[in-house]
Design a protein with these regions (language model features):
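Alpha-helical transmembrane segments and their helix-helix packing motifs
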Residues: 1-266
């Protein structure tokens, strides 16, 4: 019988070869691909927020967002891009002695900040495009609410939610490698990524969209007034949307995302 997917051992071997290539990319190409991936994930975040922002039921809103958000990773897989959370799997190559710790850490640092640049580009374009004006500015208020919730997360919740999130992201990437055709890869990516969005788990690169766009929206008095009216946010909570407070999310979530890669080591 013809086999329509790669076996687990073939998946690991293929992914390790890809990881070795990622670690040895020229710096300029690594930065460019990192910017692309950050932008693609941010586009997934922007479109999923647009689809879900006016839905009152939390479960339904997350389900709708979960249907849309996976497009970001799909674009990365098919078009190309270096995504920090996916590149955490390079640790497999370190364990297999294909890549050094220095090469792994260099890649993760460069890709992390390149993802941030890409996400910030989309954040800026979204704010100037008028996208946040949807539903009388409710989308802008929603962006503020989401950002406030994220910067208020506790370190323990950030780490554990980050672990849960990137387990699913790594599974999506490995399942996409297992699939041998485009349709199979689409569905392989879709379900694990939808699961992490519906679960409300924390993804550091996605948060490079959600937190900065909320900070930008908080500079618009119309969005601020709408956020206070619709979501009961206080002026103090909104004023807490600062770069310093964003580290309350980015540091523990990034740690959690990195720790989850250990689940893929054989």
């Amino acid at each position: 019988m013809e086999q329509h997917f790669n076996t687990p051992s073939e998946v690991i071997d293929t992914n390790m070869k890809a990881g070795e290539g990622k670690a040895h990319l020229p710096l300029g190409k690594m930065i460019l691909l990192g910017i692309m991936a950050g932008a693609f994930i941010a586009l997934g975040g922007a479109t999923s927020s647009t689809a879900a922002h006016a839905i009152d039921n939390v479960g339904l809103a997350r389900f709708v967002a979960g249907i849309i958000f996976p497009v970001g990773l799909m674009i990365i897989v098919f078009v190309g891009g270096e995504l920090f959370t996916g590149n955490c799997l390079i640790v497999m190559d370190v364990v297999g002695k294909k890549v050094t710790w220095f090469e792994c850490i260099r890649n993760l640092i460069v890709v992390y900040f390149s993802n941030l640049i890409g996400a910030l580009i989309i954040d800026t374009l979204i704010c100037f495009s008028g996208n946040l004006d949807y539903t009388g500015g409710l989308l802008g208020a929603y962006a503020i609410k989401v950002a406030v919730g994220k910067v208020g997360i506790s370190p323990l919740k950030g780490i554990t939610s980050g672990i849960l999130c990137n387990i699913l992201v790594c599974i999506a990437i490995l399942m996409a490698v297992a699939a041998t055709d485009i349709v199979g890869k689409v569905w392989a990516i879709f379900f694990p990524i939808m699961a992490f969005v519906v679960g409300g788990f924390e993804h550091c690169v996605a948060n490079m969209f959600y937190i900065p766009v909320g900070m930008m929206a908080a500079q618009n008095p119309v969005y601020v007034a709408k956020a206070q009216e619709a979501y009961g946010l206080t002026a103090e909570q909104i004023q807490g949307l600062t770069i310093l407070h964003s580290l309350n999310n980015f540091i523990p979530v990034t740690i959690g995302n990195i720790l989850s890669s250990s689940s893929a080591i054989r």
